[in-house]
Amino acid sequence: PTWSFLYRTIIKELVAHGYRCIAPDHIGFGRSDKVVDTSWYNIARHTKNMKQFVERLDLRNVTIMVQDWGGPIGLAQVARMPERFSRVCIMNTWLHHDGYEYSPGIQQWIQQWSPGGLFEANVPEKFTLGGLMAMATARITPQDSVFKALQGETPVYEGEAGEVQHAYDAPFAGLGREGHSGPYRFPMSIPFHDMISGDAANQLQNFATINALKVPVHFMWGTEDPVFVTDWGRKWSSLIPHSTFDEIVGARHFLQDTHGPEIAQLLLNYMRS
């Protein structure tokens, strides 16, 4: 449910140190167009879109930062066009492969967006994506947000919670259910649920390619993420012997939002070295 706003503090820090930052919004999210047909959304199509984006801008010597769907979509670019990338930063994500264990958190997320699930049935009529992000980043409790909304009450988002809620709601303001087709469909494209829509076969190939990379690879992992747990992050890092692994202690799934300056400083240190 996010967009490039998620990287706002990371971008601010990197630009202040002279780096050029490019933060695209996937189609269906952020400031990009919103395709209303849910069947349009699949990972192979988004991967192709991103490949065209990189090629049109002729991006080279890229340090790529990926998280969540950035793994399947973003790391595919590195696997297919390695000559364009000089460094990789991997945060709380995955690539489908034989033996990968989908956490209870992932399975619950799929269930909540399945037909009749908690979020599928109530977003955006009773509960907005901005409210979900305020809750997911611990700016408001579930009791004061989603539970109130489901009971017909209007959650009150104050201070930082209000700022976050407004920012993540902004791209979907006034669009209704059809305008939310991207957020509805993405969870259903996880290969645990749908191997074809999730582009599982290509993810498997890309996993092997990424693990054989010779460029610097840095893992930065939020330790409190129930979706992509720390043990998985460390296991993946161990498959790339020259990679580094940093725990972002206390960070949840959307670590860029809550721990941006810390992530930026780690990346700056690695790039300087």
Language-model features: locations:
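Conserved HGGG/HGGXW glycine-rich cap/lid loop of the alpha/beta-hydrolase fold
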Residues: P1-R31
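Glycosyltransferase donor-binding loop in the core domain
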Residues: T2, D225, R252-L255
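Flexible "cap/lid" subdomain of the alpha/beta-hydrolase fold that forms the substrate-access gate
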Residues: L6, F29-M65, W69-I240, E247
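Hydrophobic residues on the short alpha-helix immediately C-terminal to a glycine-rich phosphate/catalytic loop
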Residues: I10, Q77, L266-Y270
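A short linear boundary/processing microfeature
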Residues: E13, G174, L239-H242, S273
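Conserved SAM-binding loop
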Residues: A23-P24, V66, I90, Q256
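Catalytic active-site module of serine/aspartate enzymes centered on a nucleophile-bearing elbow/loop
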Residues: H242-S273
